[in-house]
């Protein structure tokens, strides 16, 4: 799971609508991919990012990033390269995502987060 994917994900439980974001990442295995820096992509994704989530991830994975989210950052190529590296090159292979609201843990296996609810969770939500 790339960090860009993580930044767009939220808890799937009904009770967490609007509150289950950003998910906390725990990683037992991660890799750094080598992808060419894409200036236009990074510049265009910039306004869609959740900066609280980016700050937590950058600290967790020790990727220092300037968290000044002013417009001049879009002209700073070094900042955009670091952001691109964090979003597109860092991939969590195994680990978990935890909802900050309900504490539901979603496993990550082979780079794929499993966001499906268990059968008992589905029936519980139907009853509510």
UniProtKB/Swiss-Prot annotation:
Q: Where in the cell is it found?
A: Nucleus, Nucleoplasm; Cytoplasm, Perinuclear region
From which domain of life does this come?
A: Eukaryota
What Gene3D superfamilies does the record point to?
Answer: 2.20.25.10
Tell me the ranges covered by the TRM112 domain, including all copies: 2-111
Q: Would the keyword Nucleotide-binding turn up in this protein's UniProt record?
A: no
Q: Which GO terms describe its biological process?
A: maturation of LSU-rRNA; maturation of SSU-rRNA; positive regulation of rRNA processing
GO cellular component, alphabetical, reads: cytoplasm; nucleoplasm; nucleus; perinuclear region of cytoplasm; tRNA (m2G10) methyltransferase complex
Give UniProt keywords alphabetically.
Answer: Cytoplasm, Nucleus
Q: Name one Pfam family in it.
A: Trm112p
A molecular function (GO) term: protein heterodimerization activity
Annotated family: Belongs to the TRM112 family.
Q: What does this protein do?
A: Acts as an activator of both RNA and protein methyltransferases.
Q: What is this protein called?
A: Multifunctional methyltransferase subunit TRM112-like protein
Q: Which organism was this protein described from?
A: Dictyostelium discoideum
Q: What is the lineage of its organism?
A: Eukaryota, Amoebozoa, Evosea, Eumycetozoa, Dictyostelia
């Amino acid at each position: 799971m790339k960090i860009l994917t993580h930044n767009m994900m939220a808890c799937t439980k009904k009770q967490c609508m609007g509150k289950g974001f950003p998910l906390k990442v725990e990683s037992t295995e991660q890799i750094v991919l080598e992808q060419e820096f894409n200036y236009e992509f990074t510049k265009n994704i910039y306004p869609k990012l959740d900066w609280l989530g980016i700050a937590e991830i950058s600290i967790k994975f020790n990727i220092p990033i300037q968290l000044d989210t002013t417009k001049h950052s879009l002209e700073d190529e070094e900042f955009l390269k670091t952001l691109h590296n964090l979003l597109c090159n860092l991939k969590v292979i195994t680990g978990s995502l935890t909802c900050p609201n309900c504490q539901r843990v979603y496993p990550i296996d082979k780079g794929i987060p499993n966001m499906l609810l268990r059968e008992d969770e589905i029936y519980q939500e139907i009853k509510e």
